[in-house]
């Protein structure tokens, strides 16, 4: 059940009445979310990638979905952003999947939302989580549709390519830092953090050429000064080995995969493969790298995502437009 913590804007032109900060329980901690109250009965639950908080990761897309009538629940995973959980900056895949389950349950409890009209929207790592979650049998999730934007579909394929952009010195030192941080975790000590992205030669999670676009795409003009853009070193290896696209053939619900053709961070091929294996998979390919949907291809992607949501959340089985009938 959602608890209102306060109202607030944060997006130009958006009033506190249109967006309020709420919290929902996941495990023993609270996840903090923005709730945009919609008018058409459908809801989009949203989250960003590894270490990407809800504001830079979802604000621009959430505002467009809300303007089209959708409710939105955009949340921070535990240990990240405004959500609870200690230690900070740690990504635990099983916990983040549980956060998604709790977020979907929260969305279903919102008074204006019809529980059968809930879609998930994820970017990068969060998109991978949705591939994994949607592959579960009916009754084990609340998803009616999924948008996977630049999905991390197969870390075992994309990570070796990403490592090719690193220097030998970093390749030798980073595993030692990650192991040291893992040992700190076992001892209950605070994590050693590294930047989410950096130039070649930096001790960062990603040093692919397109990783440098992240700040420009998600945080233009330092719009979100509180976003720390770091991750625990102990979290990098589990993400690198994460392969959520392998179960895509079990996804029976509508899936839209938004694939950047020149993506150097998660690669295009694994996401394409996953979407093609999904029985109800749809693919939008756009020119550009990992952050294309936030940059030059933004309007194209928003239009395609709204069309997908409209077709799969606002039409009944007879094909009638429920929004028009309301």
Name each model-derived stretch.
Residues 2-38:
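N-terminal cap/lid segment of alpha/beta-hydrolase-fold proteins
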Residues 131-217:
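Alpha/beta-hydrolase-fold enzymes
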Residues 251, 257-259:
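Short beta-strand/loop motif that positions the catalytic acidic residue
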Residues 64-84:
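Conserved alpha/beta-hydrolase
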Residues 50-63, 77, 269:
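The serine-hydrolase catalytic nucleophile loop
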Residues 264-270:
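Conserved alpha/beta-hydrolase "acid-adjacent" motif
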Residues 288-302:
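Catalytic histidine-centered segment of alpha/beta-hydrolase-like enzymes
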Residues 90-111:
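Alpha/beta-hydrolase active-site loop
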């Amino acid at each position: 059940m959602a608890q209102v913590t306060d109202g607030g804007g944060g997006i130009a032109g958006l009033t506190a009445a249109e967006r309020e900060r709420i919290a929902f329980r996941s495990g023993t901690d609270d996840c903090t979310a923005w709730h945009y109250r919609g008018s058409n009965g459908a809801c989009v639950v949203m989250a960003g990638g590894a270490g990407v908080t809800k504001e830079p990761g979802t604000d621009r897309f959430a505002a467009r979905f809300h303007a089209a009538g959708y409710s939105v629940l955009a949340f921070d995973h535990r240990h990240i952003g405004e959500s609870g959980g200690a230690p900070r900056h740690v990504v635990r895949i099983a916990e983040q999947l549980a956060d998604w389950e709790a977020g979907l349950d929260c969305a279903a409890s919102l008074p204006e939302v019809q529980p059968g009209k809930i879609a998930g929207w994820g970017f990068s790592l969060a998109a991978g989580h949705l591939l994994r979650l949607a592959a579960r049998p009916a009754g084990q999730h609340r998803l009616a549709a999924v948008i996977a934007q630049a999905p991390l579909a197969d870390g075992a394929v994309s990570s070796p390519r990403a490592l090719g952009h690193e220097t030998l010195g970093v390749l030798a030192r980073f595993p030692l830092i990650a192991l040291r941080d893992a040992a700190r975790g076992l001892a209950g000590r605070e994590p050693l953090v590294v930047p989410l992205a950096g130039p070649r030669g930096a001790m960062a999670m990603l040093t692919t050429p397109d990783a440098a676009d992240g700040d420009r795409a998600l945080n233009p003009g330092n719009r979100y000064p509180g976003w720390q853009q770091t991750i625990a070193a102990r979290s990098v290896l589990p993400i690198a080995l994460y392969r959520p696209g392998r179960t895509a053939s079990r996804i029976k619900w509508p899936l839209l995969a938004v694939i950047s053709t020149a993506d150097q961070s998660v690669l295009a091929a694994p996401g394409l493969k996953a979407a093609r294996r999904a029985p109800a998979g749809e693919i939008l390919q756009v020119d550009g790298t990992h952050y294309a949907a936030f940059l030059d291809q933004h309007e194209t992607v928003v239009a395609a995502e709204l069309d997908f949501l409209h077709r799969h959340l606002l039409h009944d089985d007879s094909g009638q437009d429920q929004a028009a009938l309301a």
